[in-house]
């Protein structure tokens, strides 16, 4: 019995080592870990996104200051959906985060439609691990995307400087899935940077040219296909079809 148990432990350890060896950065950086998201982790990322969507839908998200220097707010949204978790989006984000590549890839849904994608990274000269940095940095990374609202003027169209924000609050985006990795890179001054890398994929994609991220209205969920979310006062969900 003890021998069988020892063999099982050895096999599991060998499998873990093989998986780690296969998970290499494709750009020469040193791979240090990939986050295996628990249900709690997924809910945390969902909550970050939905709370920022709620702020925008409520008309409380920051906007560029006016000419008089006063604070401004983004207009409220009529039809912004509450996000749910997308397993396929998560799987693709996981695979891309594992490459450590700081560029977009073409994530697609089951139908082959392109998904939206946000990338974020945070760096430190202090080495820790993937779980610790995810816990400490994941909120800051999503918040960094949302903070682009301070640069976004509603109706101005797509901009590279505000595209993370507009994807986060794109009204008819209904699902998100993310992946997170941790790696080390060395800069031109031979300084080691330990980097947390968050990839989030969105379905359906946002950031279409000549379209606004949402409709402006103080009235909520007026579309007959929508009803109010039970979790967020200013967000909507699709009505469930009644069974015959």
Curated annotation (Swiss-Prot):
What's any GO biological process attached to this entry?
Answer: suppression of platelet aggregation in another organism
Q: What residues bear carbohydrate chains?
A: 106, 172
Record bears the keyword Glycoprotein: yes
Signal peptide positions on this chain: 1-23
A Pfam family name for this chain? CAP
Q: What is this protein called?
A: Salivary antigen-5
Q: List, alphabetically, the SMART domains matched.
A: SCP
């Amino acid at each position: 019995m003890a021998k069988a148990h020892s063999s099982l432990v050895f096999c599991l350890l060998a499998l873990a080592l093989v998986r780690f060896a296969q998970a290499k950065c494709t750009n020469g950086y040193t791979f240090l870990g990939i986050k295996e998201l628990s249900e709690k982790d997924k809910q945390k990322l969902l909550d970050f996104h939905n709370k920022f969507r709620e702020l925008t839908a409520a008309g409380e998200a920051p906007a560029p200051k006016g000419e008089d220097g006063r604070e401004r707010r983004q207009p409220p949204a009529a039809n912004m959906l509450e996000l749910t978790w997308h397993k396929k989006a998560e799987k693709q984000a996981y695979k891309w985060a594992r490459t450590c590549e700081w560029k977009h890839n073409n994530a697609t849904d089951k139908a082959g439609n392109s998904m939206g994608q946000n990338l974020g990274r945070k760096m430190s000269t202090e080495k820790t691990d993937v779980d610790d940095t995810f816990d400490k940095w994941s909120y800051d990374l999503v918040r960094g995307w949302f903070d682009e609202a301070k640069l976004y003027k509603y109706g101005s169209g797509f901009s590279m400087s505000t595209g993370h924000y507009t994807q986060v609050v794109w009204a008819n985006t209904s699902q998100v899935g993310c992946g997170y990795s941790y790696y080390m890179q060395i800069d031109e001054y031979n300084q080691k940077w330990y980097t947390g890398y968050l990839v989030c994929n969105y379905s359906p994609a946002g950031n279409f040219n000549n379209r606004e991220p949402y409709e402006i209205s103080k009235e909520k969920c007026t579309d007959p296909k929508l009803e109010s979310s039970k979790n967020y006062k200013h967000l909507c969900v699709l009505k469930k079809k009644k069974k015959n």
